[in-house]
Amino acid sequence: MYKRQDDKRRDETEDNEYRHSRGRNDRRGRRMRVRDRDYDERDERRGRGDRNDRNDRNDRADRMDRNADRDQRNDRMDRADRDQHRDEPKEDLVPVAGIVDVLDSYAFVRTSGYLPGPNDVYVSMGQVKKYGLRKGDAVHGSIRAPREGERRNQRQKFVPLQSIDSINGMSVEEAQHRPQFSKLTPLYPQERLKQETTPNKLTGRLIDIVAPIGKGQRGLIVSPPKAGKTITLQNIANAIATNNPEVHLMVVLVDERPEEVTDMERTVQGEVISSTFDRPASDHTTVAELAIERAKRLVELGQDVVVLLDSMTRLARAYNIAAPASGRILSGGVDAQALYPPKKFFGAARNIENGGSLTIISSALVETGSKMDEVIFEEFKGTGNMELRLSRELADKRLFPAIDVNASGTRREELITDPQELPIIYRLRRLLGGLEPEQAYQTLVPRLKKTATNRDFMASLIQQSGNATNGN
């Protein structure tokens, strides 16, 4: 038994000695390998200087060969691309025209009017900045024609604009140097828009006497319901088209009846822009904003533009519905923030110092029984420089044109009135000032009917005044 234990201890001792010796040999081998690697690196550093020249020459030769191979491959690819493009049919482009509507992060070319439509063309903000496009610009460009078998709305809702040929009738380079509307100098109206056309058109003749209109006028037609404001606007539009054909006439109808829109389109020789009452309030505001921006772009080119708006009250109502609530509510339920966009619209009217003018004549509703309409009118009451008031009493008695002579007038009318006629008009004003609206109407209108023109009417007043003086 003791002998077996001694043998076991001896075997364990021999195993331990073998493991220790093997570990020493492994460590010794690793040290030798590291030393050999260090020797090799040292030898390489010593001999590198001799090999650098040969390696550099070889590297340059290799690079030249690789560049030559790459050039040959590129030439072959270019020839293949040219052959492919020559064989392929060229992409067809379709001309397109419309009004630019710039939104927050993109823009559209409205091709079917001033409202959004399915055929509108998408314009990126990069193109807007590149070409200097502004809201209201009239552009002519081109889009890609749909390929054979490709449906319009197959991949994208709106077709992108490919190129622009002209902006407002000018080249793209010329459009870059046009002035900005906000930097133009406004003045009082100095050139008259004559309203007199024929002897039987008493509305225009009466307006020329009591409330003359000039280029750059900012006027309000204050009217109760059923007093003839729409007919008055039609007469003003037709008179401007007849006497001043150089003026660009725009009639903006907001929240109106469809039949009135049709009647206006058939009777007015101008651009009629409308949004009927069956459309949402956002469409009313969109039409008004794009129309006034279009007018500004024309004024920047030195043109005379007249905008007839029917009505400012309905436009303010639409903004009150469509604009986000500010939390500040005026009497009648009018949001204070909703009145700023209509004021911006109305305030754009001005006579430009070095040519061009923007005239805005808008109607405003009163005596409707709505507190909101009263608040809206009071906000715009002092902003205009011309006011034409229509009388409910005269309209109820079917006395048309139902113009309240004493309540109507124009600021600085001496700038647009003939100096020879001005003293006569002042004398007539003093004569009619003490009369009631109906008496003033019955005094003035029958005498107008007896004469063919306002000049004859003025001459008759002078003659009558001279006879009265001689008689005394």
Regions found by a protein language model. Give the residues of each.
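P-loop NTPase catalytic core
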Residues: 237-239, 249-472
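Short alpha-helix capping/helix-loop boundary micro-motifs
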Residues: 121-129, 205-206
